[in-house]
Amino acid sequence: MDGSFVQHSVRVLQELNKQREKGQYCDATLDVGGLVFKAHWSVLACCSHFFQRIYGDGTGGSVVLPAGFAEIFGLLLDFFYTGHLALTSGNRDQVLLAAKELRVPEAVELCQSFQPQTSVGQAQSGLGQPASQDVKSHLKEPTDLDEEEVFRTLSLASVDQEPRDTEQPQLGTPAQSTTAFLCGKLTQALKPSPSEDKESEDCKEPPRPFEAGGAPLQGESNEWEVVVQVEDDRDGDYVSEPETVLTRRKSKVIRKPCAAEPALGAGSLTAEPTDSRKGAAVPVECPTCHKKFLSKYYLKVHNRKHTGEKPFECPKCGKCYFRKENLLEHEARNCMNRSEQVFTCSVCQETFRRRMELRLHMVSHTGEMPYKCSSCSQQFMQKKDLQSHMIKLHGAPKPHACPTCAKCFLSRTELQLHEAFKHRGEKLFVCEECGHRASSRNGLQMHIKAKHRNERPYVCEFCSHAFTQKANLNMHLRTHTGEKPFQCHLCGKTFRTQASLDKHNRTHTGERPFSCEFCEQRFTEKGPLLRHVASRHQEGRPHFCQICGKTFKAVEQLRVHVRRHKGVRKFECTECGYKFTRQAHLRRHMEIHDRVENYNPRQRKLRNLIIEDEKMVVVALQPPADLEVGSAEVIVESLTQGGLASQLPSQRLCSEESFASPGVLEPSLIITAAVPEDCDT
């Protein structure tokens, strides 16, 4: 034929096989009993109805096949790419079985022609059917309902972009009766954990197994060992991942045949599922992170990760666990013997109870630590310390970056908590006593200690202020010692905290990361942004003082106002001893001492009045005309009106040498008694 190359299709298939052997352009990952095979979805779909039905839309992913196919799946894969099937008398039965289940008709025909007298389907079914009838039963087109149910329940670990909140696959669906033979009869299975039987009645039941249809194999018990994929519930910190980590666990499924149902071949994938689902497990959802579980028991264990509770404690060594299963495994390893185990130094024969102590001791002999910095001479005992050193001192980037805001973190857990709190607004850790939500486990523990247990063990030696954490105390001590260890490399200004230095650096770079969602205005700090939103874009004054009833738009303004009622003025002038509630007021006051000539400060009203004598409060309610000239109430009234110089003669005021200027008034006045009629001048 003109214009055609008959060997073109053969050459293309050969090139695809070479790509498969090199792992090039392979978009399919097949996990068969722990062995990983790379292939092309297009080739798999062309050769197998099994893959064509599931991945006909071209969606990439990975499929987990039964471990029984591990020895012969490579032969089938070679057949897909070369057309040659290496059959022997030893592997013929296994290849035929796999070809039936994966729906590869050409491979089935080759197996039958290789040994036409024996049939795996006939030997296993025990019904006396010839091999041809058994093969036809596998190759015939099932109904749409059967095929949909079959392929919906296959054990797929799809690598898609959407987060998976449910465990795969969920037991309890009737279609899983058709996948039991696909997974195969395994030889061993883990026994159900005894702790699940010892839990409370409302949560001790694991998900009920499905009732599989079909007759049992002759000479075998009515049990199948099915490999399912469930969520890894190891003892560790809660991690809100976009993709659920899956592990393989063996679960025993009891097969209960029904007397009314017809006898079907055990190996058939087209067995119709039962319509009755009596006692099927209903998924339950976590109210905090909306993760779904198959039973209340798993939900109860999962909630402990939000609360940080570890109720199961080893009586021998005191180690605690989230789950009782982990405690039983720990006890099975004979923790008492492990605690009595000693480690001996090979140089000086000194013994240690812990391996880490021995490693630290060996440094005294060798002078070398296992982890060395490549940029300097420092050495470390742990890899995480070396990583932290490289980031802080040598500018190495943090390994885990946030895709939304490009912020980097040392660990994946920190990144996931950051995404949940900052970008999704989730606070996954909930206090069981008051319902308070925290963004981290450490924040929840701090809340419990401070609010419910009143534990503040770290006390300042200067002002007796107590703190829940030692780091907060150390930061507070810098206000007394004047230590400012963080210095700007551009202008040399020093700060007490790294956060303050970061805020200052934005004044040099011009960065304004906090933007208003209502207008185009941007801010360098979050506090000014909140005040801007409260004053510009929120109606009303929702925050009010419970003492005097004054209302405010921003909660920070209310906090400053309450300090005046309490008499708290922590910003003190070093020149004259005046105290102020805000640092801005202190800076404005310092201008008095800087200016020498032609300074006439603006008269300010009295901002707050603290009266310790209750009798003065009653007298203060009287009209000013009824009071005597020398009483304190007239002075207070004059101060509030801002006209002290015009209402009182100069000789009525007591002179103080500490006053730097006669026109400067203290912004607060504490009155304990009436002012005398005559004052010495």
Swiss-Prot record:
Locate the compositionally biased regions of type Polar residues: 121-134
| Segments of skewed composition (Basic and acidic residues) | 194-208
Point out which parts of the chain are CCHC-type zinc fingers, as ranges. Answer: 312-337
Q: Name one GO cellular component term.
A: chromosome, telomeric region
Query: Cross-referenced Gene3D superfamilies, in alphabetical order?
Result: Classic Zinc Finger, Potassium Channel Kv1.1, Chain A
List localization entries: Nucleus; Chromosome, Telomere
Q: Which residues of the sequence carry a binding annotation for Zn(2+) 2?
A: 314, 317, 330, 335
Q: What is this protein called?
A: Zinc finger and BTB domain-containing protein 48
